[in-house]
Amino acid sequence: LGTYPLAVCGASMAESDSQAYFLPFSAKWGSDNVRVGAPLLPFTLAKLRSGSKVGALIDAANDQDFIRDVAWAMGENKTIEAQDGKVVFSAGPDWVPVPEDATIRAVGGEQSNVSIIIDERIMLKIYRRLRAGTQPELEIARFLTEVARYPNTPEFLGALEYVTDTGEHTALAIAFSFVENQGDAWTALVDGLDRSLEDLTLRQDKKATVESDLERLYTFPLDLAARLGKRTGEMHRAFATPTDDPAFASEPISEDDISKWAQTLRDESDRVLGELEKRMVSLPEAARHHVATLLGVREALNDRIAAIAATAPLGIKTRIHGDYHLGQVLVSKDDVIIIDFEGEPRRSLAERREKSSPLRDVAGMLRSIDYVASAAVDRFATRKGELPDQVVAVATAWRNRANRDFLSAYLDAVQRTQIC
């Protein structure tokens, strides 16, 4: 792309397949770029020299000029010839033109990809780990934006892909509309519940009931759970939008589906319990106790999985989020925005694109809500050095109430459908 080489770097692992990573390069000439304290020094890969000139070779994902060029190329639907294929920039119908003086800023936090905000209107996500094949996030973003018109996810704006001469696609980057937000729902709920538990211990009314504590302390977190249930149900209705596209057309759940899902559960259960059993002797005593308890119910787990395998098929399977938890939800004013449709990172692209029961997403979110209560209680105990029974009781009641509110709102949103 202009003067920026778009490189793919390979990494070979001793016990796994080789991996490919997208690493665009940018050359920054001038001694100021290699001095101690240079702004781009943390992203410098090597020192450059050409005659008397010196400079830095940096990761171009951190070069504002490169980001502007990527945005320009998307808007122009530019194609660049490449080895054994081509690099294709494409803009969706809602593409937002980027001015030359557009502001560029990176999104902080631990991420496996690079997220950049352009002109406070576009969020550019550059994929680091590359996988050949259709990227679920890319096709889902297009479907939800252009077909289902689902409003509670960022609009798809554009994409950057490498397309081989044989037609195989590899997603390099994707652009969405930028949504102003107050952070993710996980942080909002854990922080809110933690503050509420702290307030509980400071109150003089020690005889307050658990239910009154919930009503007086947790209005915001409880409202958020109901709103999230509603938006989740609407997302699943969007995925069930009638379409001729075989990648998104809903299908009846079959006996083979039930059998396959049950076998996947069985395999994962055996793998996890087997690993725990092997490592048990090296665990701390407290952890060994919990592992022993879990291993003691292995037969009950197998019985539960067998019951699932015997369940009669009911409802439809559709595309789903696939990695649904509170960290994938942004709090935006008094609403929620659902993001990150890449699917579970440890699964192949083909597995992530498989249709499944929408209730898989529901189960993932209920588990995430349960984790909120545990995280808030753990944070309280670490800070205080003690854990009053009232604190545990209120956190547990919050979890139960949040789950009920989420499920009630979800079921209201999907009523009169074949989703469940």
Language model regions located:
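Conserved ATP-binding subdomain of kinase catalytic cores across diverse folds
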Residues: 4-281, 321, 326-420
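An alpha-helical support segment within catalytic cores of ATP-dependent transferases
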Residues: 89-102, 272-318
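Short, Gly/Pro- and small/polar-rich lid/capping loops
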Residues: 1
